[in-house]
């Protein structure tokens, strides 16, 4: 899987139960109007109740050749399943949060940054 995210800290995590109108994959962020970015903790079919993280600190893979500095705004590219420091094209991603660490993406997708969700 090209996308990696893991819970890094026990600081201020908020979980909510929510039914999304489309199927979701565990740990792949979605953006919900009125709620912002949510991270599902399990795979779920459309309109199935699932638990999501609404706030917290998570680790994401950085887009190839993209540099993210600590403190920068971070955007999720839902097509390539990576994060970057510039907004993706309309309909292909969304604002995720602020970077707590920095890094530059490489061809193997092994560089990651910590992101404070909804920050």
Predicted regions and their residues:
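Surface-exposed, low-hydrophobicity beta-strand/loop segments enriched in small/polar/acidic residues
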Residues: 1-119
């Amino acid at each position: 899987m090209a996308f990696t995210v893991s819970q890094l800290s026990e600081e201020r995590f908020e979980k909510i139960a929510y039914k999304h109108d489309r199927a979701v994959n565990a740990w792949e962020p979605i953006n919900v109007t009125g709620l912002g970015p949510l991270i599902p903790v399990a795979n779920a079919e459309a309109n199935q109740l699932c638990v999501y993280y609404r706030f917290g600190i998570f680790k994401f893979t950085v887009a190839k050749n993209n540099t993210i500095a600590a403190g920068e705004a971070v955007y999720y590219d839902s097509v390539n399943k990576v994060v970057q420091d510039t907004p993706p094209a309309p309909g292909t991603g969304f604002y995720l949060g602020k970077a707590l660490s920095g890094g530059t993406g490489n061809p193997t997708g092994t560089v990651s940054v910590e992101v404070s969700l909804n920050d």
